[in-house]
UniProtKB/Swiss-Prot annotation:
Glycans are attached at N68, N142, N226, N251, N268, N670. The lineage of its organism: Eukaryota, Metazoa, Chordata, Craniata, Vertebrata. The chain crosses the membrane at residues 312-332, 342-362, 410-430, 644-664, 673-693, 711-731. Residues 1-20 form the signal peptide. It comes from Rattus norvegicus. This is Zinc transporter ZIP6. It is found in: Cell membrane; Cell projection, Lamellipodium membrane; Membrane raft; Apical cell membrane.
Length: 741
């Protein structure tokens, strides 16, 4: 009994050992049979013809890029440059990539069309890169079983054996090559009930019968069209590379080193075959192509909202700027005080900072922009379809780096402008300080000559009185009546006659000046005489102060061109009628307001932040401008109501310019970039030519004010203007305002 039991146990153990060997032998026999059947015909491809064409194409490649049947690194680099995968490029696209096969509609220079990744099961890629089985020594351990009429299972060999069932998608064997050169196989088959699926070698293609069954099942699944599939079909490789990792753009050196090849090695045809999968993988994964159409921000409002914001924002901005003329009514009592002069100096400096900052930090970068924000309303859907990883890399890194690069360069230009302003201003202050110090040192020496100078002064005053009597018939009565009139609120803006004689007026010998200017008048000689006599002695006091009162107005006209309250002398305002002066204000300021409205309208069509930036710049430089216009009209004899009315009429052209800018920016978006460039030039001209000289040639000491106080106040205004424009430029993409009706 024990002997029988022992024999049974031995036989059982022998059967248990020999059964796996039998299975292995049957598996090997099955593989050999499959290879013999498909030796000359693999998945519909004639191997003999494929090998012949492979040799032909290799000969062509080596003939173009190699020498003596070998390919050097330089030749290989030229090959990569020719197919466009040697470096990252930006490709402009204008359509949505809803499925991967849509790349066939690209232009010829993009050359990355795909004919459906499911067709890769026919070993089309192996026809281009044969001998893939030379690197594959292992087998795919993943298997799939089917029972009854159960749908096929999708086995994924690259995700650690995890299986995902699908009832509508059936794919055949797909060869996938990553940059490291390791080959993976994605398989699917529909076995018969009760039959166990064997392991499939990645280098062994499916048989013809299996291929036909897979094709029938694929067509059947497509006809059924399962509703559970909610997104377009993608190949396994594309979904893997776009979601799980970032394909690096390999150049020639990286491709060689990643395949274990020396950079100095000479490649033959066999070694070049190993590089084919990596090259095809980079072309297929578009590793070296970046679509600039995906760089647009998803949070930009649609164009319909932008048009509504443009009209509303432009109307509000123009209205606020136009109402600045009413501010002159409030500031009339303050115009006689020193505080108003400090305020005006700060406003001029603020205008310089905002105008130049808007030109260099906003208008010029937007005029060089390669895309327009208004046609990005379809981009959020495109970003969602491409995945969050691609959207994050393209939208944030690329756009922010390119836009902020222009912003930092503009900020550097502003730094150079501010540096030169500081240098010129500080040198002027140092020179004035030295002159004042020398003047204080000479005072003790001149004390001895005080009595003699007093006597000389009396003699000169008597002589000037006699000359003025002679000159009475040759000059207008208005010049003589100027001193007898009641001083208006605006007369206090000018320095007194004593201040003019001591500081602003260049003194000359009375007889020479009288002989030169009395016969011919001073109408055409004021400016030249002022500069010709600027450096002469100040020992004598000038005699005809009325003439130099006119000269003082011309001095302010030359050095303060942007302040309209000092452009015209009192007699010019009286001689000109109210209607003529009103026409000058309406046309002159109206043209200026039209250009401002044009810039604001075009800027608001670009976006809310763009319109806000330009509106702030226009507001800051229009504030002293409108105050000057109001003062000129009041000085001409107008009432407050009339001055407000004429300023309102000139503001109407600003609304017309705003409407023109909105229409141009909305319907001709390429023209708006040119408007931005033109506006930047206008802003820079107004800031540097009109306002900076007024800052540098201030008459602070003439009014008993500190020059250093003016200096620090002007610096505060400039830096504040720079800071406002810089903040708007940096955070403009986050300034979003939507209007829903």
């Amino acid at each position: 009994m024990a002997t029988n039991l022992s024999v049974i146990m031995i036989l059982t153990f022998a059967l248990w050992v020999t059964n796996p060997l039998h299975e292995l032998q049957s598996t090997a026999a099955f593989s050999q049979t499959t290879e013999k059947i498909n030796s000359n015909w693999e998945s519909g491809i004639n191997v003999d013809v494929a090998v012949t064409m492979q040799r032909h194409h290799l000969q062509q490649l080596f003939y173009r890029y190699g020498e003596n049947d070998s390919l050097s690194v330089e030749g290989f680099r030229k090959l990569l440059q020719n197919i466009g995968i040697d470096k990252i490029k930006r490709v402009h696209i204008h359509h949505d990539h809803e499925r991967h096969s849509d790349h066939e509609r690209h232009s010829d220079h993009e050359r990355h069309s795909h004919r459906g990744h499911a067709a890769a099961g026919k070993n089309s890629r192996k026809a281009f890169c044969p001998d893939l089985d030379s690197d594959n020594s292992g087998k795919n351990p993943n298997t799939s079983q089917g029972k009854g009429s159960r749908p096929a299972e999708h086995v994924n060999g690259r995700r650690n054996g995890k299986e995902s069932a699908s009832s509508s998608e059936v794919t055949s064997a797909v060869y996938n090559t990553v940059s490291e050169g390791t080959h993976f196989l994605e398989t699917i088959e529909t076995p018969k009930p009760g039959r166990r699926t064997k392991d499939i070698n990645p280098s062994t293609p499916p048989s013809i019968t299996e291929k036909s069954r897979v094709g029938r099942l694929s067509r059947l699944a497509r006809r059924k069209g399962n509703d559970s599939v909610s997104e377009p079909r993608k190949s396994f490789m594309y979904s893997r590379t776009s979601n799980d990792n970032i394909q690096e753009c390999f150049n020639a050196t990286k491709l060689l080193t990643s395949h274990g090849m020396s950079v100095q090695a000479l490649l033959n045809a066999t070694e070049f075959n190993y590089l084919c999968p990596a090259i095809i993988n980079q072309i297929d994964a578009r590793s070296c192509l970046i679509h600039t159409a995906s760089e647009k921000k998803a949070e930009i409002p649609p164009k319909t909202y932008s048009l509504q914001i443009a009209w509303l924002g432009g109307f509000i901005a123009i209205s606020i700027i136009s109402f600045l003329s009413l501010l002159g009514v409030i500031l009339v009592p303050l115009m006689n005080r020193v505080f108003f002069k400090f305020l005006l100096s700060f406003l001029v400096a603020l205008a310089v900072g905002t105008l130049s900052g808007d030109a260099l930090l906003h208008l010029l970068p937007h005029s060089h922009a390669s895309h327009h924000h208004s046609h990005s309303h379809e981009e959020p859907a495109m970003e969602m379809k491409r995945g969050p990883l691609f959207s994050h890399l393209s939208a944030q890194n690329l756009e922010e780096s390119s836009y902020f690069d222009s912003t930092w360069k503009g900020l550097t230009a502003l730094g150079g402008l501010y540096f030169m302003f500081l240098v010129e201003h500080v040198l002027t202050l140092i020179k004035q300080f030295k002159d004042k110090k020398k003047k204080n040192q000479k005072k003790p020496e001149n004390d001895e000559d005080v009595e003699s100078k007093k006597q000389l002064s009396k003699y000169e005053s008597q002589l000037s009185t006699n000359e003025e009597k002679v000159d009475t018939g040759e000059r207008p009565e208005s010049y003589l009546q100027a001193d007898s009139q009641e001083p208006s609120p605006f007369d206090s803006q000018q320095p007194t006659l004593l201040e003019e004689e001591e500081v602003m007026i260049a003194h000359a010998h009375p007889q020479e000046v009288y002989n030169e200017y009395v016969p011919r008048g001073c109408k055409n000689k004021c400016h030249s005489h002022f500069h010709d006599t600027l450096g002469q002695s100040d020992d004598l006091i000038h005699h005809h102060h009325d003439y130099h009162h006119i000269l003082h107005h011309h001095h302010h006209q030359n050095h303060h061109p942007h302040s309209h309250s000092q452009r015209y002398s009192r007699e010019e305002l009286k001689d000109a009628g109210i209607a003529t002066l009103a026409w000058m204000v309406i046309m002159g300021d109206g043209l200026h307001n039209f250009s401002d409205g044009l810039a604001i309208g075009a800027a608001f069509t670009e976006g809310l932040s763009s319109g806000l930036s330009t509106s702030v710049a226009v507001f800051c430089h229009e504030l002293p401008h409108e105050l000057g216009d109001f003062a000129v009209l009041l000085k001409a004899g107008m009432t407050v109501k009339q001055a407000v009315l004429y300023n309102a009429l000139s503001a109407m052209l600003a609304y017309l310019g705003m409407a023109t800018g909105i229409f141009i920016g909305h319907y001709a978006e390429n023209v708006s970039m040119w408007i931005f460039a033109l506006t930047a030039g206008l802003f820079m001209y107004v800031a540097l030519v009109d306002m900076v000289p007024e800052m540098l040639h201030n008459d602070a000491s003439d009014h008993g004010c500190s020059r250093w106080g003016y200096f620090f106040l002007q610096n505060a205004g400039i830096l504040l203007g720079f800071g406002i424009m810089l903040l708007i430029s940096i955070f403009e993409h986050k300034i979003v305002f939507r209007i829903n009706f």
